[in-house]
Amino acid sequence: MTSTAFRQSSKLRSRGKSILVFNGTITGTPALATGSGTENDPYQISTAERLKWFRDKVNNAKTSDETKICAVLTADIDLNNEEWTPIGPSESSAYTGTFDGQGHTVRNLSITGDVKRAGLFGCVIGGAIRKLTVAGSVSCTVDQGWCGGIAGYAERETIENCASLCTVSYTGKDARVGGIVGYVPSSSSMTIICDCYNIGNITGSSDTGGICGYNLSGRIFNCYNVGEITGGNYVSKIVGYGQANNNPTNCYYLSDTDTDPAAKTAAEFADRTVVLKLLKAGRNDSPWDSCQYVATAGITLPVFNGQGDAHNANGGRQEQLRVTKQLFVVSELLVGQAAKFLPGKTANKEIARDNIIILKGTVQRQTIHFARIVADKRHIVL
């Protein structure tokens, strides 16, 4: 990627030295991500430009070592709905390294047109993707396309602690579409998809699932889907089409009417003692942390540890509160109207209402928040 600086004869001064430019351009490349790309020293990615640089480095790799470079996200990234070329566009150019989102979110992913292997990642083989949330949309019509919010194709891969908030529409013939992964092929080594969830609505022509569209050798467990799943043949809330010996385990989906044991109501998803407890599966090191209201879905759902900001476009944090000490607010709340906080006031008044805006500390400037205040005891857990 280059950027034009000058298009005329100019004399510049940079770092104490003069540069003479004759009717040309000064070009440059985005700042490289820090790190060396090894597992012990992964590239540190904090901006959309650096993520694009990382993608291009993988997609233009000349050797297998270059496709297995490793990276971590150090901040949430906004792709601004610019057309995205997936990382690892085909099986022959697959990404084979380890990518750790560190709990961050890549927002406003946009993929359209005739992309055959679609997702933030197109094809991943023999590596790992961890602790990553992706939000955006994919809308393609190409035949025999594979698509997932995280990856279109995953072979001998580990995908864990990942979430997709992507809306996916893949309507070409013989598409394989999933909330997390589109297609897991037959392989001597198993692909692992665990502790993941999908919120986005998924539409495919066939082989369409809330977690995986087509699964031949993947082990899928401790996952859930609350998105609407529609398509032709082999459509399911968890896995569209799969081998009998690879059925998902301890996975759940949203339904207020189904009698399937995997179907759970909105109330059960919001209850810490039901779906959240099932997903934890008795593990002390479980990534599942709490139940939080997710604006994208419009209901309260289990989320990962430290994922409070992932589902709010403005970075706000909405979640149930565990009360361990007194709660204070700066001023009274006007029920059904605006909540007004005055500058210079210190939070010093105990409140006993439910579902309130809570402040701790001193307000530095006047702010007015418009919100409907309602009583709902579920939002404060004693």
Would you name each region that the model predicts?
Residues 12-324, 330:
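Surface-exposed repetitive/solenoidal architectures
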Residues 366-381:
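Short, intrinsically disordered C-terminal tails of secreted or membrane-associated proteins
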